[in-house]
From Swiss-Prot:
Naturally occurring in which organism (per UniProt): Escherichia coli (strain K12)
Underlying gene: yccM
PROSITE patterns the UniProt entry points to: 4FE4S_FER_1 (PS00198), 4FE4S_FER_2 (PS51379)
GO CC annotations on file: plasma membrane
Chain ranges on the Periplasmic side, renumbered to this chain: 55-91, 182-195, 333-357
Membrane topology of the entry: Multi-pass membrane protein
Keyword Transit peptide: no
Binding-site residues, [4Fe-4S] cluster 2: 261, 278, 281, 284
Protein name: Putative electron transport protein YccM
Location relative to the cell: Cell inner membrane
Listed InterPro entries: 4Fe4S_Fe-S-bd, 4Fe4S_Fe_S_CS, NosR_regulator
Keyword annotations of the record: 4Fe-4S, Cell inner membrane, Cell membrane, Electron transport, Iron, Iron-sulfur, Membrane, Metal-binding, Repeat, Transmembrane, Transmembrane helix, Transport
Cytoplasmic side: 1-36, 115-158, 219-309
């Protein structure tokens, strides 16, 4: 009687029960969460500093002055998109909110190379959404999964929002964008954004509350269905050379990769993950118990040869390196801060609630 052949597989080095300990330097999830917390802390600092800067002008200089944080430009994606159109047409950096455009370009480059890594490694909204989802999972023991007939149309909403903003940017001539960026509204655009959060109306409060509650039950509700920024990164990420790739020969069909994927991608059924929903978070890679089976790489992993694959520490180095390189360029070029005279800020910021488009 012929002896049945058993599939032999090699356990991923350092794993216990198929997982690496959280404090193992090879654990990609630990590197990602550390990067997320760093960016979240930076954005909290930016928000607090910006609030103090605005209050200085609102109180007629009676409070402590702090310099305007240039990082607030990262919260002006529409200005960044419009300025990107202006720069592509004219070949020049915009005079106001150039940093918003450069940060947008940095995040596009990250998505172009590393899938939607901006969403899962850098975005503070994505981090908060993930934390809320984790809380919901601990409180209720599970996450809701919407049926396909509802999930697919809802995922299309963020692309409709993205199309609207791209249409606005494409519709405006470069000269019109230039004049708009010099307008009083553009100068205090960041202050208007702060006012939106400081003085929420009833409808906005209800919407935010519903979204927060939904995020407890539906993982990444905002990111999956409504975020136009993530939609843009997803479209760009289709060109990414790095993808999650699976070696079907060594795969033991345990299904852990698909079960743990926060985007609910059936990784265990695919040879390479092309979908716009993949954020490059590497959760599936960390869930795989078999060596050389699931990688975030340029080519399919193989048991008999080493393919170049991205590790957690290298992903951290790349996403932070690209972002800080662009910030460094903005500082070197003198556009990290918009060249707005202090007297103009002194006059416009107290009037910001009354300034329209």
């Amino acid at each position: 009687m012929a002896e049945n052949k058993r599939t032999r597989w090699q356990r991923r080095p350092g794993t216990t029960g198929g997982k690496l300990p959280w404090n193992d330097w090879r654990n990609a999830t630990t590197w990602r969460k550390a990067t997320q917390l760093l960016l979240l802390a930076m954005n909290i600092y930016i928000a607090i500093t910006f609030w103090y800067w605005v209050r200085y002008y609102e109180t007629a200089s009676s409070t402590t002055f702090v310099a305007r944080p240039g990082g607030i430009e990262g919260w002006l994606p529409i200005a960044g998109l419009m300025n990107l159109k202006y720069s592509l047409v004219t070949g020049q950096l915009p005079s106001v909110h150039a940093a918003a455009m450069l940060l947008l370009v940095a995040f596009i480059v990250i998505s172009l190379l590393l899938k939607k890594a901006f969403c899962s490694w850098l975005c503070p909204v994505g981090t908060l959404s993930e934390l809320i989802g984790d809380l919901g999972n601990k409180l209720f023991g599970r996450q809701c999964v919407l049926p396909r007939w509802l999930d697919i149309p809802l995922r299309g909403v963020k692309y409709l929002l993205l199309s609207f903003f791209i249409y606005i940017a494409l519709l405006m001539p470069a000269q019109a964008i230039h004049y708009f960026m010099l307008s009083p509204y553009s100068v205090v655009m960041d202050v208007k954004m702060l006012d939106f959060f400081r003085h929420m109306g009833t409808a906005t409060l209800i919407s935010v509350t519903v979204l927060l509650i939904a995020s407890l039950f539906i993982r990444h509700a905002w990111c999956r269905y409504l975020c136009p920024y993530g939609a843009l990164m997803g479209v760009v990420s289709l060109l990414s050379p790095f993808k999650i790739r699976r070696n079907a020969e060594s795969c033991i069909d345990c299904g852990k990769c698909a079960k743990n994927c926060p985007s609910r991608i059936p990784v265990d059924k695919l040879i390479q993950v092309r979908t716009v929903e993949c954020t490059g978070c590497m959760t599936c890679v960390e869930s795989c118990p078999v060596a050389s089976t699931l990688t975030f790489s340029l080519q399919k992993p193989a048991a008999n040869k080493k393919a170049f694959a991205l590790s957690g520490w290298l992903m951290t180095l790349l996403v932070l390196g690209i972002m800080f390189a662009v910030i460094g360029y903005a500082m070197y070029a003198g556009v990290w801060q918009s060249p707005v005279p202090e007297e103009l800020y002194r006059r416009l910021i107290p009037q910001a609630p009354m300034i329209g488009h």
